[in-house]
């Protein structure tokens, strides 16, 4: 019974360490994503440019009234 308790304690201890390491890695990944504003700016620019290019023909049609 004592060896079973030791084994369970060891498994619990190793599992706890593993979970804490995973949590630290996940937190580091989240911080890295939050710390990179350039990537967000590029994504916003891409979305803005695609919307602007999609609306350009409609705008030109309204301005020149030649559809």
UniProtKB/Swiss-Prot annotation:
Keywords: Amphibian defense peptide, Antibiotic, Antimicrobial, Cleavage on pair of basic residues, Disulfide bond, Secreted, Signal. GO terms for cellular component: extracellular region. The keyword Disulfide bond applies. GO terms for biological process: defense response to Gram-negative bacterium; defense response to Gram-positive bacterium; hemolysis in another organism. The keyword Signal applies. Expressed by the skin glands. It is found in: Secreted. Belongs to the frog skin active peptide (FSAP) family. Brevinin subfamily. This is Brevinin-1CDYc. It comes from Rana huanrensis (Huanren frog). The lineage of its organism: Eukaryota, Metazoa, Chordata, Craniata, Vertebrata.
